[in-house]
Structure formats: C-alpha cells, structure tokens
Amino acid sequence: YTQVGPNSNWYFGNLAGITFNSGSPVALTNGALTTTEGVATISDNSGNLLFYTNGINVWNRNHVIMTNGAGLLGDQSSTQSAIIIQKPLSNNIYYIFTSDNDAGPDGIRWSEVDMTLSGGFGAITSNKNVALLSQAQLSSEKICAVRNCNNQDLWIITKDWNSSVFRCWSVDPSGIGNIQTWSATG
C-alpha cells in the first residue's frame, strides 16, 4: 500500500477520502467534495495534499475552493471528469484537464494552477477552461495522461464520442502542444 508521493491522498464520493502516507490506507473524513463520479487529487512528492477537483470546483489543501477555482467546465457525472498533471520541469505549475458529460458542448478543456499564488495555497490562473476541441469534435467522458518515452513529457489522450478516433496532446516544459489524431482502432 505504500504510495507516498503525488498519488498519496484520494478524495472522492460524498466527503470521503483515503491517505496512504502511513503505509496502510487510512480513511479521511475532512474533504469538501461531493460527487457521483469522476474526481482528481494531487499531492506533492512528500505526500502532502495540494488540491483536488470534481471537474467543476477545485479545493485547496485546507478544503476551501481555491482562488478562481469555481466554474471549471467538467461535469461531476462524467466518469473521468478531470485529471491533474504537473507541468514537466516545473515545481509549481499544474494542469487540470476536464471532460464534459456524454458529448457535451464543453468537451475537453484545461486550466492552469499556480501553487505560488494565494500564499502557497494555489490559484487558477487566467488560463482557465481553455478549449482543446471545437464543439464539432465531440469527446467521450474518457481522458488519461501517459508518460512519454523520454520519461519527462506526457501525453493527454481522449476518445471521440461514438467513434474510433483517439486524440492526443503532448505536454512538455513549454506547455500543451498541438493536437495529434489517431484513428481506426477497430
């Protein structure tokens, strides 16, 4: 069970959570999140909670909605409403990628969190709800992040709605890259 690091703390469901910092799972009851499906949580490399989201609101480590942290365009009923990644080679910048529900009009978007803001509690910057897909490119509720073979950069991967098309974006130290399309998976 030992899992100290960015995935040490999980918040989900109805005010529920688990921490793995002690070596065994321990229930947490201090969260502010209430959601039926998708969530994302991120901690620092020492296992200290940074923030968590249901794809709509972002709570800081004190379980208070962070500055500019309301109004993300994910959907709490989306099976994967959000994922959080750390910007490669940055100690303080994180990206939240959100996914709308069932081919909804808000599609796949990203927002930037700067942990140096708001006294170290973090804030969403002006890069909030930036669209990755046009409304004509409806996405499913699926989104994931995969480490690049260079062991530094990442790929964000989504699947189009009712289609075999997968779309990928690279994330490297310069930010979020151009769209790449993979298709015909069968």
Stretches with model-predicted labels:
Residues 4-6, 19-26, 66-68, 116-130, ...:
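Beta-strand initiation motifs
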Residues 29-33, 40, 72-74, 97-104, ...:
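Short consensus segments that form the blades of beta-propeller domains
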Residues 1-53:
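Beta-strand-rich domains and repeat architectures in extracellular enzymes and scaffolds
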Residues 16-25, 58-62, 102-114, 162-170:
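Structural motif
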Residues 27-28, 49-82:
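Active-site-surrounding "flap" and adjacent substrate/cofactor-binding loops of secreted or lumenal enzymes
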Residues 1-4, 33-48, 73-92, 133-153:
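Structural signature of eukaryotic scaffold interfaces centered on beta-propeller domains
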Residues 101-155, 159-160, 184-185:
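Asp-box/WD-like beta-propeller blade repeats and closely related beta-sheet repeat scaffolds
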Residues 9-13, 43, 50-54, 91-101, ...:
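Hydrophobic core segments of beta-strands in well-ordered, beta-rich domains
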